[in-house]
Amino acid sequence: MTSYTEVIQDGMIRLLKSGKLTSASATAFSLSPEMLNEVNADMASYRERIVLRQQEISNNPGIIRRLGVIAMNGMIEADIYGNVNSTHVMGSRIQNGFGGSGDFARNGYLSILMAPSSAKKGTISTIVPMVSHVDHTEHDTQVLVTEQGLANLRGLSPKERAKLVIEKCAAPEYKPLLQDYLARSEQFSYRRHTPHLLTESLGWHSRFLRTGNMRPREES
């Protein structure tokens, strides 16, 4: 297995060390002090398996497309239709930059976005009715992954995607709430192609900011 990416971090060095990864191409390192010392101490071994390129090359959409990269990016949250927020907590506090994730998500042979299904000891669901900030649209997201499962969204209608994301990716404690939201959206939304209840779609985020929990009090 080889890696064509933007930044090499500790996990990739461990994969190289184990032999599971044979080579890695990137534009920079972002290593912990401990891992940096380890790499410097064994540079003769790594220099044959790591190449650093200009960002114009490492993030070049045409090269990413021609290589057939399987693009795997982390996310903060995804909504039931496949829109992804990878940079902003609660829609306004930036956690990290966008980086090259857009180049890889849009141009990779397969675009995978992943996160745990919940955060903050279960008080936050990473699968929500509507994301509070959009970095990757539903048109670029092909596969969503959490520890609960995998949702292959390719070729599906919005309502098919929503049902699959809830079934495969949502945390068990949030799944009934998402199913209820979708059912009521299908019944009461303005139009039914991509059902939403606009008075509720960002309500989970508002509830967390008020109470410290996305779940209603009687559910938590």
Language model features by range: what are they?
Residues M1-S220:
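Conserved phosphate- and dinucleotide-binding cores of soluble alpha/beta proteins
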